[in-house]
Amino acid sequence: MTLWVGILVGVVALLIGVALGFFIARKYMMSYLKKNPPINEQMLRMMMMQMGMKPSQKKINQMMKAMNNQTK
């Protein structure tokens, strides 16, 4: 009888740990993405305009492709 109780407690503790870990990781990633949003085409266009460059769609596509290749 005590063996089954031990196994049951272990399985329940494992499930609680997995669920708790999932929610903690989810909250961390949401706050991280809120503080550091991924760069999109609109942000690149604004950065280029601030640097005094005229942002053409070809240049923006090249920069997006280069950044995507860099993260792989």
From Swiss-Prot:
Organism: Bacillus subtilis (strain 168)
Family: Belongs to the UPF0154 family.
Transmembrane segments: 4-24
Membrane protein topology class: Single-pass membrane protein
Pfam families assigned to the protein according to its UniProt record, in alphabetical order: UPF0154
Keyword flag Transmembrane: yes
Superkingdom of the organism of origin: Bacteria
Subcellular location: Membrane
InterPro entries, per database record: UPF0154
Main localization (coarse): membrane
Keywords: Membrane, Transmembrane, Transmembrane helix
Keyword Repeat assigned: no
GO cellular component: plasma membrane
Protein's UniProt name: UPF0154 protein YneF
